[in-house]
């Protein structure tokens, strides 16, 4: 069961969630436009919890030339689960993804 929240707590949680969505959408837009590299996103994830919580599949799908099928195929090849976040990637998985998008 979820804990009861006061109106102020609920408003603060909604604001945090909105900020996370905006930041992740901005990252995906910058990736799609080529203004940001996959390595840049991994660097940001080390210092920014909102970026670190982004799903790997969503970030990979935002890369130029990547769609739903090619993203699923790549993540399967590397051994990355669908729900994995950037924070949860292992060293080898990061290296393989950076190599793929270099």
Annotate the PLM regions.
Residues 47-50, 65-68, 80-83, 91:
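Alpha-helix boundary/capping and short turn/kink residues
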Residues 76-102:
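Accessory alpha-helical DNA-binding modules that contact the DNA backbone or grooves
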Residues 26, 70-73, 96:
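Generic beta-strand or strand-like secondary-structure segments
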Residues 59-75, 90:
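Helix-hairpin-helix
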Residues 2-63:
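Long, highly charged, low-complexity intrinsically disordered interaction regions
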């Amino acid at each position: 069961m979820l804990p009861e929240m006061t109106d102020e707590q609920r408003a603060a949680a909604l604001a945090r969630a909105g900020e996370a969505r905006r930041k992740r959408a901005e990252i995906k837009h910058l990736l799609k436009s080529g203004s940001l590299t996959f390595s840049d996103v991994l660097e940001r994830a080390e210092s920014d919890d909102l970026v670190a919580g982004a799903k790997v599949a969503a970030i990979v799908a935002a890369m130029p030339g990547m769609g739903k099928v090619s993203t699923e195929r790549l993540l399967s090849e590397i051994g990355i689960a669908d729900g994995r976040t950037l924070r949860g990637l292992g060293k080898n998985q990061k290296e393989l993804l950076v190599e793929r998008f270099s």
